[in-house]
């Protein structure tokens, strides 16, 4: 049985140990690679201030790279009796290197270690989410251009209202993703600051070089105040969760639209048969389960900020074990969102559009505003034109050629997709993922 890093002479009650460890061994597997990267930067700094010899550093780096590779292969495990990933890595180093392995924790606490792991994990996941969003964005813009001349009804209060187009529909969700990415970018900038060196939350008497570890890990800056570095635990996760929830809100709305538009009562779009499921009793059914589940998963993700807020609510400054529970809802959320983005991207690329929706006379009245505007352009006061068209509708005399003449920015005839694409490109460039990627490659000795 492995000893705990804090092992005392009194044996802890087994039920207490089980309860306090909780799901940490499971959750910390998400953090294994990042814990190793943090340790590599930390020991490189320790050698620079004389707490490790060059030979000891070389030995530790060799073993840490080996542990990193095992985590990459999915072979890293946290043994029974070992509390967390930090303890497991130190245990492995001590088994392999003896006393040299015991030196790795100098100037460090599990408090700043887990905070560092979370930040390294989170910024990597934000990059992957951003890449998935960008892929969906390009599909939506492409479909917007492809179907820009196909009209569809626009709705207010779920009543037919005015002409819209599939160009507008696809493009609207593309532009929504641009704004969502601004939230994600803000979360990334907050996350991309180095907490290492704050130790238990009050710094260290070792002459740590925090600027060095900041550069080694590719952070933009560091959390300067060591007390605030620890106060950021919970706050960082909550703000990232808000960004994920914002994206989830867009995807949930898109999924809802797709479910409605795919139904026989609307018939605006058709999902590929291979993307639908059937019924055990009704042989004709082709259910949009993929979008129903996407909607549910995204609605669940929208509750994430509140869950984190309630766990961390009313905590004073300093570290508290309450924060451990946040990992259980926070760490898996990224994969859930990426799955939803991947499914949505695939379906949006394959979806078929009904190009003759407005041939149905039940949609005739959506052109009433077009007629009002035509009369107004010819000189009739708008309110008089409004009343005339209203009376024509009531009398059953209204007719229209079903043509639209919208030319202003962002309208049916002028989608501004190039401008929206430029906004997305500038937003993506603002993340500056290159710094973190290069730092990680350098630490691992990879090109």
UniProtKB/Swiss-Prot annotation:
PROSITE patterns: FUMARATE_LYASES. Keywords: Amino-acid biosynthesis, Arginine biosynthesis, Cytoplasm, Lyase. GO terms for cellular component: cytosol. InterPro entries: Argininosuccinate_lyase, Fumarase/histidase_N, Fumarate_lyase_CS, Fumarate_lyase_fam, Fumarate_lyase_N, L-Aspartase-like. It is an enzyme of class 4 (lyase). GO terms for biological process: arginine biosynthetic process via ornithine; L-arginine biosynthetic process. The keyword Lyase applies. NCBIfam families: argH (TIGR00838). Belongs to the lyase 1 family. Argininosuccinate lyase subfamily. This is Argininosuccinate lyase.
């Amino acid at each position: 049985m492995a000893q705990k890093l804090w092992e005392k002479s009194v044996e802890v009650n087994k039920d207490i140990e089980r309860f306090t460890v909780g799901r940490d061994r499971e959750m910390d597997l998400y953090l294994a690679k990042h814990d190793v990267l943090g340790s590599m930067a930390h020991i490189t700094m320790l050698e620079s201030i004389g707490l490790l010899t060059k030979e000891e550093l070389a030995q530790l780096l060799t073993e840490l790279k080996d542990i990193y590779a095992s985590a990459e292969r999915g072979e890293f495990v946290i043994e029974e009796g070992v509390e967390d990933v930090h303890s497991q890595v130190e245990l492995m180093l001590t088994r392999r290197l003896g006393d040299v392995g015991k030196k790795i924790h100098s100037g460090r606490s599990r408090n700043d270690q887990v905070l560092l792991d979370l930040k390294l994990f989170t910024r990597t996941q934000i990059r992957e989410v951003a890449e998935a969003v960008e892929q969906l964005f390009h599909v939506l813009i492409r479909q917007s251009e492809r179907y820009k001349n196909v009209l569809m009804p626009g709705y207010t209060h779920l009543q037919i209202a005015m002409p819209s187009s599939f160009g507008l529909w696809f493009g609207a969700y593309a532009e929504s993703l641009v704004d969502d990415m601004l939230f994600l970018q803000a979360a990334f900038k907050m996350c991309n600051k180095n907490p290492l060196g704050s130790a238990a939350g009050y710094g260290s008497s070792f002459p740590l070089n925090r600027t060095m570890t900041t550069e080694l890990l590719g952070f933009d800056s560091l959390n300067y105040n060591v007390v605030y570095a620890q106060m950021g635990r919970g706050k960082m996760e909550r703000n990232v969760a808000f960004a994920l929830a914002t994206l989830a809100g867009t995807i949930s709305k898109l999924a809802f639209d797709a479910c409605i538009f795919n139904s026989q009562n609307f018939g605006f779009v058709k999902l590929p048969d291979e993307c639908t499921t059937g019924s055990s009793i009704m042989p004709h059914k082709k259910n949009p389960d993929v979008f129903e589940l996407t909607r549910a998963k995204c609605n669940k993700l929208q509750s994430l900020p509140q869950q984190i807020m309630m766990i961390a609510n009313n905590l004073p400054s300093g570290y508290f074990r309450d924060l451990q529970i946040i990992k259980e809802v926070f760490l898996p959320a990224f994969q859930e969102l990426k799955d939803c983005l991947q499914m949505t991207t695939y379906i949006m690329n394959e979806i078929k559009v009904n190009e003759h929706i407005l041939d149905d006379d039940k949609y005739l009245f959506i052109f009433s505003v077009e007629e009002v505007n035509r009369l107004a352009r010819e000189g009739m006061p708008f309110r008089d034109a409004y009343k005339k068209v209203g009376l024509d509708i009531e009398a059953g005399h209204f007719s229209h050629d079903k043509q639209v003449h919208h030319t202003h920015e962002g309208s049916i005839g002028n989608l501004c997709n190039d401008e929206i694409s430029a906004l997305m490109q500038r937003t993506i460039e603002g993340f500056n993922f290159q710094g973190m990627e290069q730092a990680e490659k350098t630490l691992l000795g990879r090109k």
